[in-house]
Swiss-Prot record:
Residues 380-389 are annotated as: Important for oligomerization and fimbrium assembly. Keywords: Cell adhesion, Cell outer membrane, Fimbrium, Lipoprotein, Membrane, Palmitate, Signal, Virulence. Residues 1-18 form the signal peptide. A lipid is attached at C19 (S-diacylglycerol cysteine). It comes from Porphyromonas gingivalis (Bacteroides gingivalis). One of its GO terms (biological process) is cell adhesion. Residues 19-46 form a propeptide. This is Major fimbrium subunit FimA type-3. It is found in: Fimbrium; Cell outer membrane. It holds the Pfam family FimA4_C. A lipid is attached at C19 (N-palmitoyl cysteine). One of its GO terms (cellular component) is pilus. Structural subunit of the major fimbriae. These long, filamentous pili are attached to the cell surface; they mediate biofilm formation, adhesion onto host cells and onto other bacteria that are part of the oral microbiome. They play an important role in the invasion of periodontal tissues. Fimbriae and their constituents are major virulence factors. FimA proteins from different strains have highly divergent sequences, and this has been used for classification. The sequence-based classification correlates with pathogenicity.
Length: 389
């Protein structure tokens, strides 16, 4: 009889565990209130693929804190609102996150959640499921039903009525929207350029998830290039990943859904602190003006000029320091402080090549470099950067 009783109690415990799975093992609390939260996501733009992917909320999680203690947590899938979260009345803090994947959030203190970080991954490059966060917000809950960001028709205690809580992407997007070869008069009858690959040459590996700035002081970086350079912008802590490199495809209507760039994390340039600029780069071959291969004499001359990687290899690079200050760069769209990559922004780069490139794309470019860059910044907020090389 005792064995049967214990067996039934075990089944009941398992059933309760299963019921709580969707609520992230919701903390036990004496609830006399509920909170429902509706969100506003940032504007979608055409992703590297399907147009709506960048704004997709695959999993939405709301946490309720009483001081530092997590009082409630609830997640839903494919929705922009979480309803009837059981909690207590009084002063509370709401923390909202989206697309957190397998991140363990249940039971974390408010300080622990604020200290969370993320790393740039191959999965981020698929656009769908980009992680999003909103800064913690303090609310006063009353006994009964509370609604954050709703239109007021629900009754109950309305908080921030008509103004949903906005969550923003942790990532930014950098991409070429134009690569045009228009050699200047000095080079028009001598050289041409054939693009082959696009790289995120220098990209921050980690960022914070919360804070006025998500950029941290960690000096770890990623690169999509197989070649290791020794330049002023080369990070000391540098890891190669092949998913930050891709073959070049001609930019145009036929390839509108083909990626021309990458999703990256927020970063700040501080040379003396070991923090490097984010660099997007196009690699290819320097050729004669008619597209044929350079002669051995021409390659030797180009190598001696620092344009190609060897006297028998015409590979050359055109690096663009994204959102950087340079006389070769012009910007339109939203103003973003130079030297920074800021979350939830897209940096669209129009590159005009007017002469030979460089054999070390991680060195500073000269003001007389053969490129023009125009960058458009928007939100998703966008920056258009025009570059002339």
């Amino acid at each position: 009889m005792k064995k049967t009783k214990f067996f039934l109690l075990g089944l009941a415990a398992l059933a309760m565990t299963a019921c709580n799975k969707d609520n992230e093992a919701e903390p036990v609390t004496e609830s006399n209130a509920t909170i429902s939260v509706v969100l506003k996501t940032s504007n979608p733009n055409r992703a590297f693929g399907n147009a709506g992917d960048e704004a997709k909320v695959a999993k939405l999680t709301v946490m309720v804190y009483k001081g530092e203690q997590q009082e409630a947590i609830k997640s839903v899938e494919n929705a922009i609102k979480v309803e009837n979260i059981k909690c207590g009345a009084g002063q509370r803090t709401l923390v909202v996150m989206a697309n957190t994947g397998g991140m363990e959030l249940a039971g974390k203190t408010l300080a622990e959640v604020k200290a969370l970080t993320t790393e740039l991954t191959e999965g981020n490059q698929e656009a769908a499921g980009l992680i999003m966060t909103a800064e913690p917000v303090e609310v006063t809950l009353v006994a009964g039903n509370n609604y954050y960001g709703y239109d007021g028709s629900q009754g109950g205690n309305q908080i921030s009525q008509g103004t949903p809580l906005e969550i923003k992407r942790v990532h930014a997007r950098i991409a070429f929207t134009k690569i045009e070869v228009t050699m200047s008069q000095s080079y028009a009858n001598k050289y041409n350029f054939a693009p082959e690959n696009i790289y995120a040459l220098v990209a921050k590996k980690k960022s914070n998830l919360f804070g006025a700035s998500l950029a941290n002081s960690d000096d770890a970086y990623l690169t999509g290039s197989l070649t290791t350079f020794n330049g002023a912008y080369s990070p000391a802590n540098y890891t190669h990943v092949d998913w930050l490199g891709r073959d070049y495809t001609e930019i145009g209507a036929a390839t509108v859904n083909t990626p021309k760039g990458f999703y990256v994390l927020e970063s700040t340039y501080a040379q003396n602190a070991g923090l490097r600029p984010t660099i997007l780069c196009v690699k290819g071959k320097l050729t004669k003006h008619d597209g044929t291969a350079l002669s051995s004499e021409e390659m030797t001359a180009a190598f001696n000029a620092g344009w190609i990687v060897a006297n028998n290899d015409p590979t050359t690079y055109y690096p663009v320091l994204v959102n950087f200050e340079s006389n070769n760069y012009t910007y339109t769209g939203e103003a973003v402080e130079k030297g920074k990559i800021v979350r939830n922004h897209k940096f669209d780069i129009n590159l005009t090549i007017t002469g030979p490139g460089t054999n070390n794309p991680e060195n500073p470019i000269t003001e007389s470099a053969n490129l023009n860059v125009n960058c458009v910044v928007a939100a998703w907020k966008g920056v258009v950067q025009n570059v002339i090389w």
